[in-house]
C-alpha cells in the first residue's frame, strides 16, 4: 500500500486516481519518486536527473552511467584511474607529435619553407584579380633556346633595322654640345668646366 512516509504516494485522491500507464503523455516510470498531479512527469524526472547529476559531480568518483565520469589518480573504480586509461583506450589521444632530439633541423626548415610556398602558390592559383604574384618555384621550366635564343638562329635583319641599330650605337651617338652660336664643345671640355664651376660655387 502506498504511504506518504515511504515516498510512494501517487495521488492524494483515490477517487481521481488514474494509473500512470493510462495517463496521456506518460513516457515511463521513475522508481522511488513520488508522482502526483501537482508535479508533472517532465518536472519530476528533470529534478531527479539534476539531483543525481549534482550528487555525481560532488563525489566525482562514479561511473558515467550514473551521472559523472571524472578520471583521478586514486579511485576505487579501475576504469577511472589515469594510469589505466593511459594504458588502454586513451593512449592514442596523448601520443606526442614531436621528437625529443631534432637531428635534421635543416630538413624540417626546408619542409616548412616548401609548405609556405605551396600555400602561396595555392593563393595565386585561386586568385581571380591577378594581384597575387606567382611563385617561381612552381613555374614549369622551358627549353634554354626558347628563353635565350642564339643570335644566329634569329631571322636576318633588314637594311632599315641595321641602319637604325648603327645609328643608336654608343660609338655613333653625339656626345658634344652645340651652343646657339654654332660652337661645339667636346665632353672633356664640358667636364673640366663643370668641375671648375662646382669648385667656384
Curated annotation (Swiss-Prot):
Its main location: cytoplasm. It is found in: Cytoplasm, Cytoskeleton, Cilium axoneme; Cytoplasm, Cytoskeleton, Flagellum axoneme. Keywords: Cell projection, Cilium, Cytoplasm, Cytoskeleton, Flagellum. GO terms for cellular component: axonemal A tubule inner sheath; axonemal microtubule; sperm flagellum. The keyword Cytoplasm applies. It comes from the Eukaryota. Microtubule inner protein (MIP) part of the dynein-decorated doublet microtubules (DMTs) in cilia axoneme, which is required for motile cilia beating. Binds to the intra-tubulin interfaces. This is Ciliary microtubule inner protein 2C.
